[in-house]
Amino acid sequence: MVSKLDTAWDLFLEGKTSEAKKLVEQDFSIDTCTDFSLLNLMGYLLLAEKDYASCTHIFEKYILLAQQNEDKENEHIGLHQLAMIYRDQGDFHKALKLIEDEEKIVEEYFPNDNLKKAVNNYEQGYVRFKLNNLDEALTFMNLSLEQSL
């Protein structure tokens, strides 16, 4: 049996964000939610609506929850997601700081995971490009490409 959350993710991935949100929002409370998948989905749904304040609050909670559980996998995901929110708003310096924080976790806890490294380096390259640091951006983009092959 497929859960409401799985169905909502499927709807989101099909671009049906309002349908996805209707399916899960009544069960969602930022204050009590401890489900990383639901937090992540609600964050994406609110980002699609450009509700940056709520989205930021969700991913700050996501990071705090991961830290409380010493869950480095979800901590690095939360940092990456929060960086995407700041990037979407044009706050590239704050986005870069969060991506660099994520990089430290990936390097220390996932040193052999080239996918995590490639995704992080792509984001570093993209944000540095947006900051007009073109040489640095190219270095990170090339590194991302190498790691993804």
Which functions belong to the PLM regions below?
Residues 2, 37, 77, 117-119:
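Residue register of alpha-helical TPR repeats
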Residues 25-29, 61-67, 100-108, 142-149:
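Amphipathic alpha-helical segments of tetratricopeptide repeats
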Residues 33, 73, 113-115:
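Residue signature of alpha-solenoid helical repeat architecture, marking inter-repeat boundaries
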